[in-house]
């Protein structure tokens, strides 16, 4: 099947009431210029839609190219998530021949869409950048991620492409995973992965035939370690962070001994929780997976606002004293 151009989808979405089959109650949310709010990627474009009756916001994903096994995979994922009750995930629904598009790309005019809840918030990397000078928020988001990571390790399914760009931080600080294209569910056992995930967050030995409930394990360990380090020493984010990369990248995974980021991290092992997460990272790296009991290594103490501020204030006071005593500054 040949899929429509982005411009053709936009035109169809403008008149969604006429062009949707079952979703005719949805209308596009428009930006300041009167255009539908949308986000595009390599394989799909996502529109922000609103239910005219309830006011609820939804995300409608329209596809730009063919992917083998996509329909079957989405149906299996939707079936699995139907019985999962968690704030970390949002339900999805795959609808065949849902949107009519007058396209020049082929003879087909009806195309599938994926319906999801719209998740309002910032991607994890943007949240870190916006709060890089707020030690409490950095500590709290590290704690929240480790809670989510611990929960994921206990599940039989896996997200498949765990990275900051696919983790949304709501206004209340809660985390939500989005983009389930690479998800593994037990019903897929024996299949090959449809995608391998971001190179900066996947294990260097991950291949398409490695497709099981453990494919998130290394990503969880890497992100958890990076967040903890940033919460303790934010300047390392400025030094090593780039794009949606927090600290570590594919180059580090290939040669740990010569990783500048890991070398900086190892100088901070006087912190008990950081040492704990560093051990988890090395364990995930050596085995390309973590056992179900490893989740306890992600259990961090919930940060208290006054405690974090007091620690930072003390550190600043010591620094100022040292500068005064040595004539620095």
Feature map (PLM): residue ranges:
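Helical subdomain adjoining the active site within ATP-dependent kinase catalytic cores
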Residues: 229-319
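Activation of the activation-loop gatekeeper triad in protein kinase-fold domains
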Residues: 179-183
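Juxta-kinase regulatory segment immediately upstream of eukaryotic protein kinase catalytic domains
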Residues: 1-37
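Conserved structural core of kinase catalytic domains
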Residues: 91-133
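ATP-binding glycine-rich loop module of kinase domains
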Residues: 36, 45-90
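Catalytic-loop of the protein kinase fold
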Residues: 153-164, 169
């Amino acid at each position: 099947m040949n899929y429509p151009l982005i411009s053709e989808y936009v035109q169809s979405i403008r008149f969604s009431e006429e062009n949707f089959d079952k979703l005719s109650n949805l209308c596009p949310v428009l930006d300041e210029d009167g255009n539908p709010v949308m986000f595009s990627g390599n394989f799909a474009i996502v529109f922000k839609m609103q239910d005219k009756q309830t006011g609820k916001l939804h995300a409608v994903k329209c596809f730009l190219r063919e992917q083998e096994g996509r329909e079957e995979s989405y149906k299996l994922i939707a079936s699995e998530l139907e019985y999962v009750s968690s704030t970390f995930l949002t339900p999805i629904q795959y609808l065949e021949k849902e949107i009519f598009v007058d396209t020049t790309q082929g003879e087909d005019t009806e195309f599938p869409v994926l319906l999801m809840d719209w998740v309002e918030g910032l991607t994890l990397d943007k949240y870190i950048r916006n709060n890089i000078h707020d030690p409490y928020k950095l500590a709290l988001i590290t704690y929240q991620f480790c809670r989510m990571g611990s929960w994921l390790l206990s599940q039989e399914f896996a997200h498949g492409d765990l990275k900051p760009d696919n983790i949304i931080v709501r206004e209340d600080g809660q985390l939500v995973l989005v983009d389930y294209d690479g998800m593994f569910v037990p019903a897929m056992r024996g299949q090959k992965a449809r995608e391998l995930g971001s190179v900066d967050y996947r294990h260097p030995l991950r291949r398409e035939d490695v497709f099981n409930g453990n494919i998130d394990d290394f990503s969880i360990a890497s992100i958890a370690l990076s967040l903890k380090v940033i919460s303790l020493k934010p300047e390392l984010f400025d030094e090593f962070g780039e794009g949606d990369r927090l600290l570590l990248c594919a180059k580090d995974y290939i040669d740990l001994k010569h990783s500048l980021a890991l070398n900086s991290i190892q100088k901070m092992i006087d912190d008990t929780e950081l040492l704990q997460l560093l051990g988890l990272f090395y364990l995930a790296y050596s085995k390309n997976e973590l056992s179900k009991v490893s989740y306890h290594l992600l259990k961090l103490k919930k940060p208290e606002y006054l405690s974090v501020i007091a620690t930072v204030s003390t550190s600043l006071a010591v620094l100022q004293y040292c500068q005064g005593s040595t004539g620095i500054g």
